[in-house]
């Protein structure tokens, strides 16, 4: 099949390209951006020289629909909702890696502070949490989940949906590598501000909060909100979500382990660890590693969920959704050993 990538020069766009080039069933037909149009991508990113040398093209939906079978949007929030309209009109498959189609329009406006897509368009998009939402060939439009949301939702979904934890007790402390802040120059991600430092940002205001709540409420209506904090750590890639919660009355700790293993037993990219996971065990992969510890003294269950924010938190999950949409094996192009060192 042939694909097009819009937003090729960002971190996520580049990672999407890297994964697509190693996919057994995919040819990258065109790449698009607002800048460097007409320039070979390998002239901007020399690591691609001799591997992929196509020119960056101006965005043209008609050209994409003529030459490709699917379009990926790896664009900043506020872009895809406008550029995707013609694809939706023509029922042409779209996977949007931005937040533009994840939330209802009123919630999007509140949290993103940008004009939303229409209700009709948003309802046509399926939220692409691959292990949970049963993505298939019936789905034409996918709203790829956010990175923090992916790590948090996959850790909580089995427990929330089976009513094993108190939904009024959830605290999430999530930490991200610097690529999660995007490529745009910003004072908060300046080298001297993040090197040898730990920076908490968007406390109680991160746009993934309503996404997480919306998704988990679908499986347990009792959940009203979560306490969620986000911090930057001085690594390039990765997310560590540390979650604190309490068990429902009568629930035993062995039920937590058995539920995780039962829910995810046929999910190739979820690994339930015997101990707590480490970030370097997932970097460069599409895996989500989940582990937990229960404190008998305080009655607190601590869950740790780790992912590579650029792969499972973005490009890898997008490829996984593409595989499910087009009836490929779910793991095609995604069997990657962790970089580890």
Swiss-Prot record:
Name the Gene Ontology biological process terms.
Answer: L-arginine biosynthetic process
Gene3D superfamilies for this protein: Dihydrodipicolinate Reductase, domain 2, NAD(P)-binding Rossmann-like Domain
InterPro entries on file: AGPR_AS (IPR023013), AGPR_type-1 (IPR000706), NAD(P)-bd_dom_sf (IPR036291), NAGSA_dehydrogenase (IPR050085), Semialdehyde_DH_NAD-bd (IPR000534)
This enzyme's EC code(s): 1.2.1.38
Q: Which Gene Ontology molecular-function terms are recorded?
A: N-acetyl-gamma-glutamyl-phosphate reductase activity; NAD binding; NADP+ binding
Q: What is this protein called?
A: N-acetyl-gamma-glutamyl-phosphate reductase
Catalysis: reaction(s): N-acetyl-L-glutamate 5-semialdehyde + phosphate + NADP(+) = N-acetyl-L-glutamyl 5-phosphate + NADPH + H(+)
What's the superkingdom here? Bacteria
Please classify the protein's predominant subcellular localization into one broad category.
cytoplasm
Give one Pfam family.
Semialdhyde_dhC_1
Write down any Gene Ontology CC term. cytoplasm
> What does this chain do?
Catalyzes the NADPH-dependent reduction of N-acetyl-5-glutamyl phosphate to yield N-acetyl-L-glutamate 5-semialdehyde.
* Pathway membership, UniProt: Amino-acid biosynthesis; L-arginine biosynthesis; N(2)-acetyl-L-ornithine from L-glutamate: step 3/4
Tell me where it resides.
Answer: Cytoplasm
Entry similarity comment: Belongs to the NAGSA dehydrogenase family. Type 1 subfamily.
Residues the record marks as active site: 147
Encoding gene per record: argC
Source species of the chain:
Staphylococcus epidermidis (strain ATCC 12228 / FDA PCI 1200)
This protein's UniProt keywords: Amino-acid biosynthesis, Arginine biosynthesis, Cytoplasm, NADP, Oxidoreductase
